[in-house]
């Protein structure tokens, strides 16, 4: 009986924490770039953020230069799932060094 109480308590805590995480997510903008693989990744990210974390997600049209520039100057969109960073590498690295942007992975 004691282990059943522990399991129930753990479940209640787990679901409570999950609800808080969903409430804190807010609205996230994702760049839907103008090539097929990037469009696919944007939709996968949208699905994960909406279904897994309860976020409100808005897909915004994008292309390499305008999206990178907007991210560096305005902080939007929040996510660019696939971006040809070598075309804007120096400016992006500077924005990262200044703390305005973060790479999800080093490439």
Regions found by a protein language model. Give the residues of each.
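Intrinsic disorder/low-structure terminal segments
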Residues: 12-14, 40
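C-terminal segment of classical bacterial N-terminal signal peptides
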Residues: 14-22
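Hydrophobic alpha-helical segments
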Residues: 7-8, 20, 39
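Short, intrinsically disordered low-complexity segments
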Residues: 4-5, 21, 80
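Short, glycine-/small- and polar/acidic-enriched structural segments
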Residues: 26, 36-107
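Immediate post-signal peptide segment of exported/extracytoplasmic ligand-binding proteins
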Residues: 21-29
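Bacterial N-terminal signal peptides that target proteins for export
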Residues: 1-9
